[in-house]
A protein has these predicted regions:
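Small-aliphatic-rich amphipathic alpha-helix that forms the alpha element of a beta-alpha
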Residues: 35-37, 80, 99-153
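Carboxylate-rich helix-loop segments that flank metal/cofactor sites and access channels
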Residues: 88-104
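C-terminal domain-closing interface element
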Residues: 173-192
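Residue-level signal for well-ordered alpha-helical positions
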Residues: 63-64, 94-95, 153
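Short Asp/Glu-rich motifs
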Residues: 54, 151-152, 159
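N-terminal amphipathic, basic helical "cap/leader" segment at the start of enzyme domains
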Residues: 1-91, 189-192
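A glycine-rich helix N-cap at a beta->alpha junction
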Residues: 70-73, 79-82, 156-175
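Short, solvent-exposed amphipathic alpha-helical segments in soluble enzyme
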Residues: 66-68, 97-98, 156, 182-183
Length: 192
């Protein structure tokens, strides 16, 4: 597979319409095996993923979407529900044996813990999109879901918090609008 700038960045697009075929379990595992290598603070790895990969589960996910995202969701055969785990710190003994106080996070105020988990899960989410594209698939990342419904149907008895959904598969390139502009370096960056 070509891990080129074109594949991952310059020619890759966010899709809103897909062909409906689902990915194989091998494909989903390959995406995760690359995405899990994302950098996170103290190797915290708070991202949790529910791969939705059957017609029945995709329909359940579509029903959790707000009106404007339901049809988009129904066009995809697979999706990744991305969440962050508020109990991420319970894995530090395995993930970060170098830490002197691996349980200190459990004493943090809930808002600080959530900011930490979300920031690091977002790093991993970016890698998830890059990994999916690198393996030759298209993505459709989006919010716009009833988070309580997603939690009820897909997260069960966990402390996972909904972040976003990424539709997966082969996008319908004919349904794409022209790429929107991006901010110039001078408008978005500073060098000090």
């Amino acid at each position: 597979m070509d891990f080129s700038k074109k594949t991952i960045f310059t020619e890759a697009r966010s899709h809103k319409k897909f062909g409906g075929d689902n990915l194989s379990e091998t494909d989903l595992r390959a995406i995760y095996e690359l995405a899990k290598l994302a950098p996170t603070a103290n190797n915290s790895c708070p991202l949790r993923v529910v791969f939705v990969n059957s017609a029945e589960s995709m329909e359940q996910l579509a029903r959790c979407a707000l009106d404007f995202n339901q049809e988009k969701t129904r066009t995809a055969g697979s999706a990744a529900i991305l969440a962050y785990d508020m109990d991420f710190h319970t894995h530090f003994a395995t993930l970060a044996p170098h830490m002197k106080q691996p349980t200190v996070h459990s004493e943090w105020p809930i808002d600080r813990l959530e900011r930490f988990a979300l920031a690091n899960a977002n790093l991993q989410a970016g890698f998830m999109i890059a990994a999916t594209r690198a393996l030759g698939f298209d993505c459709g990342p989006m919010g716009g879901f009833d988070t309580a419904a997603v939690k009820s149907k897909f997260f069960g008895d966990t402390r996972w918090v909904f972040n976003c959904v990424v539709l997966l598969g082969h996008g319908d390139h004919s349904a794409l609008r022209p790429r929107g502009p991006r901010l110039a370096f001078e408008d978005a960056c500073r060098i000090t």
